[in-house]
Amino acid sequence: MGYQRDKKREQVTLVVLGDLGHSPRMNYHALSLSEEGFEVNLVGFAGSKPQIEVLKDEHITLTYMRPSPAAFGNLPRVLAYFMKVLWQAIILFFTLLTSPRSKVLLMQNPPGIPTMPVCWFFCIITRTKFLIDWHNYGYTIMAINLRQNHPLVFVYSLCERIFGKQAHGGLCVTKAMKINLAQKWGIQKVTVLYDRPADRFHPISLEEKHNLFMKLSTTYSCFSGSSPDKTVFTERYADGRVIECEDRPALLVSSTSWTEDEDFSILFHALEDYEGVRHEFPDHYPPLIVVVTGKGPMKEYYTSLVAERMWMHVAVITPWMTAEDYPTLLAAADLGVCLHYSSSGLDLPMKVVDMFGSRLPVAAIDYPALPELVKHNENGLIFKNKEELANLLQDWFRGFPRETAIKETYYDFYKNLDEFRKLKWHPCWTCNALPLFLDGVSGQQRLTN
């Protein structure tokens, strides 16, 4: 069931100045708009493949922009930045001009430069409703690599404030961000829309876990068992039954961008402590297999550091997981770790949302907005430093898997995660986001099948 105007589907444009495949929230917007009777033009850059549901939807058009020339990388850093921004501004503006005419445009921020001024100007000259989906502040991300008082950071902040106030309305990812937008910049017309996990993130059967472990064992020996139908975690009997091994190791999973704003050294030192504790008390702690997904500039540094340690009780692997296997991995794990530390302190990590959707408890590093998602000792664990993470891991896995104390102690975790999973994206979107689009289109609304 959806909304339809003037006996036809109204056009909406979604803009993200980034890889469309790495923009899950914008993919979700597109799917919900299509379900509610809109034609959607999703504008961004090519890269990883968008969600299969988006690719199959006949009412969603993907418009890819031409990336900036690689030659810009040979220029001095500041000049390269300005040239890239100029290129993106021109490409984005002409892409919008040549796209189907829309009644509403929703852009993702960040990045806000040049997206905000370009989208605002386009909406002015075409009389299009201008909406912003605030995921974070771009200037705080820029300040990570520069400094808080750098001129470019000031300009970025000024741009977000000026053009953010010109929007007709918008969405944001946390209550903390909504309050901050109002108090700091006087931006009032913003509605909170929390991220929710996609349907592909869900609990799985023991057989599905076994199939994943068998697949991983062909590449990573730490998963291999002592017979062809056995892994260190599971075993398939001749009659087809799959059981968990009584002496199985624990499986820890983390997804990281391998950048400075996700400090992997925190997990590295916690694992080093765990190695020592397991060596000293082998009867009380299981071996640990750690799967770290993602790619980034510091990946090679830390993988080399792990290799140098030659740990005997902790195995760390960094596989590239397909879009199909990643949700299965989360659902097969015993604990997730999130190292995301928000540059503004106001956004929430999508990776935790996905883990919760998979019924996986998470240990996450603390920052101001995090308790809006992770409730300490209710659906997850919050730590502030490497020492606290080390203690959490040791507490969580003590006696694992033979003793049931952990499962009994954290029974409420799984009950609360089941409650979290009941609240789906589209009903939340319909309540909080759909009215913004309905206000932006003309004509009498009616329900249509």
Residue spans for each PLM region:
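N-terminal subdomain of nucleotide-sugar transferases
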Residues: M1-Y64, R278, P282, Y367, ...
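An aromatic- and histidine-rich active-site surface loop
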Residues: S23, P50, V85-L92, S102-R127, ...
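Membrane-proximal helix-turn-helix segments that form the acceptor-binding/catalytic region
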Residues: L31, P114-T126, I132, H150-G170, ...
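Helix-loop-beta element that forms the nucleotide-linked donor phosphate-binding surface
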Residues: K165-Q166, L171-C172, M177-S226
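Conserved donor-binding/catalytic core segment of Leloir-type glycosyltransferases
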Residues: L216-P228, T234-E262, F268-E272, V291
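Nucleotide-sugar-dependent
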Residues: E262-S265, W320-L329, G336-D354, A364-E372
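Nucleotide-activated donor-binding/catalytic signature segment of Leloir-type glycosyltransferases, i.e.
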Residues: P282-P287, V291-G294, K299-T328
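A charged, aromatic-enriched C-terminal amphipathic alpha-helix characteristic of glycosyltransferases
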Residues: K384-E387, P401-T448
